[in-house]
């Protein structure tokens, strides 16, 4: 089992994240972290932050490195992807990127059937409603975690309880908000020296209105540390620029090697690596059970929507935007190998993605910082069984052994039709004449891991007689194939057949 030093990298470059990352506002990072700092300070000191302390925290967060903000946004997008129903994920990406008219995007409900809440930071005790997170993330509106009641769904929204489409979510403006907006507007007009913009009729504009700034300052106290101009400016800045993420490719080189052989329908893959800190945990197949996972958790994909169009958004991406393969997304999908004549740029595209799954920047390099992703008019790859993965040839990196015995056990358990066991750790050869292992050859099972059962396999005799299970034999290393003596382990005990058919996979 391998231990990954950076357990969050293998899910940071999913096509879902690559497409949405340019549309995330950088203000969201500052806002979520500022609220968490204030809450932590209050719990520790039992008093609120002073203005100077809060302003110092704000300046620190605004000056954070771009790569830190992008990694945070990638983790949050991966978490939001799990909270969106599988059939709505593609439509959500198309709506955010402007490729499709906005429609309802349903989220997975909580146990009471209402909008779920998630934490937006690592080890944060403050939770936010999903629709609040969407508005802050993609619109840059400074809402508190208690402002869920201020959100109003649009009239065209057909599922107001669970819809998290940002285009369907508005903020209710109260009379107090309008009253304060008037004074803020007047103050900005006086400071800039420009005439006041029209607030109503021409006759109303001609009347001189005097501001009693002293009375205003005595009546209202600004609780935040953002000025009006600064707030508008930072709320419109995207989290990524035209230069793409500033991740180090060496840093993001994770254990993402998968043997995707187009000739075989069963996908053989290595077991997921676990970090030494134990931040990963085994996942179940239920979407609802994965509530708030660690940033290094496995984010499972979903099949595309049956009501979606034949052409998916991942097939229209530029050649510079690649789709890394996830460990569970292709387990049930056959992989069809496209032909070079299907696309004029297919040959050049596959040359860049043939050797090893490396982590790509994932953002189209564009001179415009806040521009959306550009899509070609023709498809790069033809329609395949899995729309998320255009890669055709993916090999193991040199530091991973493709003949890992654990991988062979997974292949043996999942795909009994194509069993060809490989060498075991390079020191001995396990020659299998059937798909079952006897109990004598198995190592002691590690505790606490999922249990898999293998069906008994029979092999017809050469004389055409009845089929009977055969016993595996062991080959002594260091001898030539012709001189090797095979020692039979003898028939199995019928009473222990279930013990021989099941074992634990590490």
UniProtKB/Swiss-Prot annotation:
Phosphotyrosine PTM sites in chain numbering: 300
Alphabetized PROSITE patterns for the sequence: CTF_NFI_1, CTF_NFI_2
Annotated positions of the N-acetylmethionine modification: 1
Modified positions (Asymmetric dimethylarginine) in chain numbering: 365, 395
Residue positions of motif 9aaTAD: 404-412
Source organism: Sus scrofa
DNA-binding region coordinates: 1-195
Descriptive protein name: Nuclear factor 1 C-type
Modified sites of kind Phosphoserine: 194, 294, 302, 304-305, 323, 333, 337, 339, 343, 473, 475, 485
Record function comment: Recognizes and binds the palindromic sequence 5'-TTGGCNNNNNGCCAA-3' present in viral and cellular promoters and in the origin of replication of adenovirus type 2. These proteins are individually capable of activating transcription and replication.
Domain notes: The 9aaTAD motif is a transactivation domain present in a large number of yeast and animal transcription factors.
Known partners and oligomeric status: Binds DNA as a homodimer.
Gene Ontology molecular function, alphabetical: DNA-binding transcription factor activity, RNA polymerase II-specific; RNA polymerase II cis-regulatory region sequence-specific DNA binding
């Amino acid at each position: 089992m391998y231990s990954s030093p950076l357990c969050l990298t293998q899910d940071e470059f999913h096509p879902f994240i690559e497409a949405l990352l340019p549309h995330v506002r950088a203000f969201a990072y500052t806002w979520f972290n500022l609220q968490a700092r204030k809450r932590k300070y209050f719990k520790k000191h039992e008093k609120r932050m002073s203005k100077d302390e809060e302003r110092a925290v704000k300046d620190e967060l605004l000056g954070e490195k771009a790569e830190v903000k992008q990694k945070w946004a990638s983790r949050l997008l991966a978490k939001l992807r799990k909270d969106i129903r599988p059939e709505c994920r593609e439509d959500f990406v198309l709506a955010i990127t402007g490729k499709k008219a906005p429609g309802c995007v349903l989220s997975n409900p909580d146990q009471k059937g209402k909008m779920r809440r998630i934490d937006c930071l690592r080890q944060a005790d403050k939770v936010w409603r999903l629709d609040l997170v969407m508005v802050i993330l993609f619109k840059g509106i400074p809402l508190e975690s208690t402002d869920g009641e201020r959100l109003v769904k649009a009239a065209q929204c057909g599922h107001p309880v669970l819809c998290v489409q940002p285009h369907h979510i508005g903020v209710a403006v109260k009379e107090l908000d309008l009253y304060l907006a008037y004074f803020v507007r007047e103050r900005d007009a006086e400071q800039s020296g420009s005439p006041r913009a029209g607030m109503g009729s021409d006759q109303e504009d001609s009347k001189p209105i005097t501001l009693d700034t002293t009375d205003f300052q005595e009546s209202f106290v600004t609780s935040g540390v953002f000025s009006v101009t600064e707030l508008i400016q930072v709320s419109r800045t995207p989290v990524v620029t035209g230069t793409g993420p500033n991740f180090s490719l060496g840093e993001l080189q994770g254990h993402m090697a998968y043997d995707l052989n187009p000739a075989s329908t069963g996908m053989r893959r290595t077991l997921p690596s676990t970090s030494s800190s134990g931040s990963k945990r085994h996942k179940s197949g239920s979407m609802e059970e994965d509530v708030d996972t660690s940033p290094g958790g496995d984010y499972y994909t979903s099949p595309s929507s049956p009501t979606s169009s034949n052409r998916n958004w991942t097939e229209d991406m530029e050649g510079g935007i690649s789709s890394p393969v996830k460990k569970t997304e292709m387990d049930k999908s056959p992989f069809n190998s496209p032909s070079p004549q299907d696309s004029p740029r297919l040959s050049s595209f596959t040359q860049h993605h043939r050797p090893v799954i490396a982590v790509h920047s994932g953002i189209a390099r564009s001179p415009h910082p806040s521009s959306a992703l550009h899509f070609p008019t023709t498809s790069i790859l033809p329609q395949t069984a899995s729309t998320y993965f255009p890669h055709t040839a993916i090999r193991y990196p040199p530091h991973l052994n493709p003949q890992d015995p654990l991988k062979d056990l997974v292949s043996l358990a999942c795909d009994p039709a194509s069993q060809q066991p490989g060498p075991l750790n390079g020191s001995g050869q396990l020659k299998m004449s059937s798909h079952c292992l006897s109990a004598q050859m198995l190592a002691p099972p590690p505790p606490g891991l999922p249990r898999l059962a293998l069906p008994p396999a029979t092999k017809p005799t050469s004389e055409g007689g009845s089929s009977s299970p055969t016993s595996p034999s062991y080959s002594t290393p260091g001898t030539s194939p012709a001189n090797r003596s095979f020692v039979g382990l003898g028939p199995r005990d019928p009473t222990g057949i279930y013990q021989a058919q099941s074992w634990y996979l590490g």
